Each structure stands twice: as structure tokens, then as C-alpha cells.
Amino acid sequence: GANIGGISDFSDEFPFVDLMKSARDWIPGNSAGCFDCREPGSNPTCNAPNACPVTINRDANGFVSSLLPNQVVTTIVHAGGTPGRLSAGNYTLRFDGSGTIQLLGASQVSQVAGEIVANISSSTGNNIGFRLTAITGGNPLRNIRILPPGGVCNNDDHRFCDGAAPCGAGATCQLFTAAGVADAQLFHPRFLKNHEPFRLLRFMDWMGTNSSPIVNAADYPSATSAFWTRVPLTTLAALGNRLQSDLWINVPHKATDAFVDAMATVLRDDFTLDRKIYIEYGNENWNGIFSQNVEIPRQFCPGFADLAAGCQNDGVSGNGIACERDPNTFSLGAAQAPCFQALVRAWGDRSVQIFDRFDAIFGASARQRLIRVIAAQAANPDLGRQVMVRNATGQAFTVASKTDTYASAPYFGTDYCTPDNGINPDNNASVYASTEAFLDHLETSGLAVSRGFMQNSKAMLNANFAAEGIRHISYEGGQHLAGIGGFTFNSTCNLRFDEANRSPRMEQIYRTYLSDWKANGDEFTQFYSVGRYSVFGRWGTLEFQDQDVTTAAKYRAITGHTTVNPCHWVGCAQGGALPQLLFTNGFEGN
């Protein structure tokens, strides 16, 4: 399986035929030249005497309904990066309403009512987007769509076609600009092709789970929203149906019961009956870099009588808000211990509540269709034990009794270019002397560390939850070559990390890693499928959507391993095959 990278204009993956869905939300600027009025220090034109309103008037779907005086608004479809990652050619921008659209990073080819054709060069590494500089009152620009060049073969919705890549004998290329094609296709065929091998898709980033502000269903994008900053639930179900893959849903940590019920209802009704849905509360709730780490105990600590007072004795005391960090030291102060205990309790309690609400919505099919997940830290499996071993608050049953799988993230390469006794260029120069030397060390020492993560998590389950039959799976995994702290921008670290990830040797290292996993766990989900490399990580198995998969060592390793080991655990059902017809030519002569 795989995590799918988040929706962002900085991504070199374009999941949807309509590129407007993955574009950046509107940026408020002004006619004097300010790009973003929310950053007044970025440009003198953002400041007085120039008017620079930050409020954007929107309709129910998020399209701009009117412009304020001196206001312009911008969206970026693709942020600058390596030239050619966004395919060259003519892009068709369609819209209802009337106004003035200024292209950015593209040249206008033609314009008629409701449509602009723009050409994008393969040589550009600039930002690509457009700006609204005027809107006709009473008839604003809306229902904006951006359709790429090319199309999809009429006999294979996973096959992209254009003049250079025809469909072949007996098939026709349906252009994305043809009537109804973009809506029916929804997903770009190259995106579908890249994800064909994965039988489990984790939507943590697609749902914008980390530090999510989402509370109610109305806060979450719908199919008609201008931008899919978070991908609609109906679209998640549609992708699973199209690929015959299982889905992994991350419920936002602030979600109300009503929103949980709404999520469950959509998935029950829209997702195929013969595939599984994995349910997880939040993501990495233990991780202090995400707001859920303190917002979960802040929400639930007042309900724990023995902890409530202690949770108030935090880094910002006296304001009645629990579990707040000191803005200067990032410390919770004396509230560290009670807030941690509140997190452990609430994490288990709320997970069980969400599991039970999904069960109630799914009814008799719940145990066949739903996989209940508790996910915690690979380096500290005792945290997962603490969450699962206790009774749910006020109940006679344990959290473990309501849990099907325990998920860890057994990354390899976590010790390189990190502070606090890491394996770094300044203390282990020989490791970084060449890419081959680095890979030698990664293949031995790096894999040994991740193997220990896997074995320790498995041992924790065997020692504590054998009776419950909780299976060990991964919520993330793969290489973790990213500099931390002062090593983030270290040139030696980044050179070796880039070269190692692109080296053909990485394929065999991954194969060994996945064999280690097979001995210690069941479902594996790579983090993540497609994404550009940066100093903050080389997470993608592919660097960009159009990459030749034969040049991608990690992708080859994962798909090759899956081919040889399609299902190695009890109850596994391989995806990718459509349901058989009741009667076929082989059934009693039809």
C-alpha cells in the first residue's frame, strides 16, 4: 500500500483531470502590485497608503463573488520547480460568468466567451496560475475548470493519450476538452496508472489530517468546492472503486459525532462492498510538531477529574486553557505529565467512540468491511501498549478489545544527519565520503535499526495482546533520509540523500527492507507514492507523475515485492480484479 501525497500546488503530481481542484486557494493581493496582503512586510505595495484587503468575498463553493476596492486575487496552479514536471502544451481554462483573467507563467492562445486557451512551455520553471482583476457584478466568474492537454483512451481509463502516445488499434483518444470526458474521468489516467499496484491507499495527507481545524461536515470540501484543499469523501470512495483498493481514512481529531456519522454514511453508500476501510483517529497524535498532540488532551482533560487541575498548570498558566505550550520554550511546564496521561486516555477513548459510530452506521457488515486501527510510535511501542491496554473510560472493556490492527512506522535511515548522537558528516565522515559508502552503511546499519523497530512492535503485541489477535501493520514506512535541525540544509547530507534515493542500489535495499517487514508485519504502506525531493525529505517512490517507472528504484522495489508477495497474511484479499460476472462463457457453456 501507499500514502498519497497531499494536495498542493508545490506537488509534481496532478491527480485530477481538472487542475483547478489541486490549485492553491485564493491569495488576496492589490492592484498596486502586492502579491499577498496577508504578508504586509513582503512588499512595500502591501502597505499604506495602498489599500490591501485580506478578506475575500466568496460564494458557497469558494469562488470569488466580488472584488473589494483595489483588490485582485490569485491562484497558483503549479509552483515553480524543475522545468517540465507540468506537461507542456495547451491548457483550457473554462468558466461561467464574466470578468478579467490575467494569466501567470503562460501565454494566451485564444479566448472566446467562457474559455481561454493558454500555452505552457516545457522550459518554464516559473509559477503557473492566473489572477482575477475584475468581476462583473451579478455575474461573477465561477465554476472555473482547468483542463490539460491530451486525453484518455476509450477502452482503458488508466491510459493517457495524445499525438505522441496514441491509444492503439481499435481505440480512440477522448480529449479531456471533449464534452463530458473530464467529469467522467475525474482522475488523470497517469495518476491511476501509477497507483494500480497498491491494494491499500492511506489518505492522511489527502484529508489534511495533521493540525486539522475541521470540526463539522460543512467545514470539509465537497465535490463542487472550487479547491480540494482536502479531498471530498465521495472522491476518496471513487478512487478506491476505480482501483479496487482498500481505503485508509483518518478522522480529524476535532470532528464532531455528526461529522463522523456523515463520513461513515458516505463511505458505506459510495464505496464498493468487497473492499476494506481502515479507520484511524487523527495521525501521530504523539507527535509534538502537530497541533493534535496538545489539542486532544486540551479538549478531553477537563473530563478526567484526577488530571483536570494538572493540565491547567501548563506553559501559559492562568488563562483557563489546558495543555498550552510556552510560546518561547515550547514547554508544557508542570502539565507535561497530566497532559500526556490525558492524551493516552482520550486517544483510546475517542478511537473507540469513532469505531463504534462507524460500526453502527455499517450495521451487520461492519466486521467484514471495517478495520479498526490504533497507530503509534515505532521507536516506542510501549506508547501503543499504554493506549490499548487500559479500559475505555467508564467501560468494562479495553481499547484493545475494539482494535483490529496496531500500526507503526518502521522507517529506515532515521539516524543520519540528525542531532543528539546521529550519524553525521562531522562525526562519521567516512560514511559520507561517497554515495557507495553511504549506501553500504545504510544497507547494514540503517536496515538493522528499522528491523529492530519492526521486531519490537511485534513483540509488544505478542506479549500483551495475543488473546485479542491484533495484527501488526504499518501506517507509514520506507526510507527517512531527511536532515533534522542544523542538518536540514547541510550540503553533504542533501547530496548523499538525493543520490542514494536515485541510485539503482536503493531497489535491493528496499527489497531487503520489505522482506524484513514481511517477517514482522502484515499490510505495509509506503510514505508516500509520488512527490518531489527537497531538503525536507525524499518521500516519493516517484519524483513526479510522468516519471518513467523503470528509472525509479523505490517504485520498482515495492511493485516487484508486491508481485512476488501479493498477500502474505490471514484474510488478505488482493485488489485489482473486478468482480466476476455471475455467468461467463466458462459456466456450463454459458
What are these regions (language model features)?
Residues L582-N590:
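Ser/Thr-rich, Pro/Gly/Ala-heavy low-complexity intrinsically disordered linkers and tails
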